[in-house]
Amino acid sequence: MNYPIMKTLILVLCSLHCFAIYGQTKNETFAFHYSNKNYSTFLQETKIKLGNIRASYSAGTLEEKDSCIHAAGILLEESFTKGAFHFWLGTEWDFNGTTNTPKVGQIACGYFVSTTLKHVGFNLNRYRLAQKGAYDEEVYLCGKQTIITIRDQTPNDLKNYFKSNLTRGLYMIGLANHVGYLFFDGKELYFIHSNYGSPDCVVIETFEESEVSNSTIFCVAPLSNNKELMRKWIENELIVVP
């Protein structure tokens, strides 16, 4: 048996399955704005947009700075839901995966989070952040005071909690043995993560349908709605991870 060819075939099938999951969303939540461009072009355009916000922020009044922080939150949300996630979709999962390039090599769940954040412009060490536990990742990135901890609830309970208590935006979620992104569009709760279940690759799926979403604990922290984190992104401030 030709194992390299079999591995390639499995990865291709995995990618197709991941795209099939994406296709089931059937709305504009994850409309891919960069389908005719490569990853480097997408990152460069994100850098330019962030630079424009940074220039306005630097010259702005307190009120204008607050508007820039809001604009950065919108940019972060769109950079992921309509850009970064799609480039990484189908990248093979591995517990020790640390690839820096989408669809080339393997990526572990923590490295998927830290690497994509690094790529869109956060000043952080992707290795140190990924090597922390999910809760500690959220503490260093988002701030301990922003974390919502929910115990002994089902994935559907978490979705209902979002509907009742939280607003549209990009979030980070830590589970008992896993970490990834959540995106809440006001109605549906999506889980974007490097999946160790089936298929074992980066996927976009509804949270309650995920094979790995059953957990005794959910730790949720805001990203796009996190003013302090958006300030750090704009100011290129180092996110310290011991």
Predicted segments with their positions:
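Conserved active-site beta-strand-loop modules that form the wall/rim of enzyme catalytic pockets
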Residues: 11-12, 122, 170-171
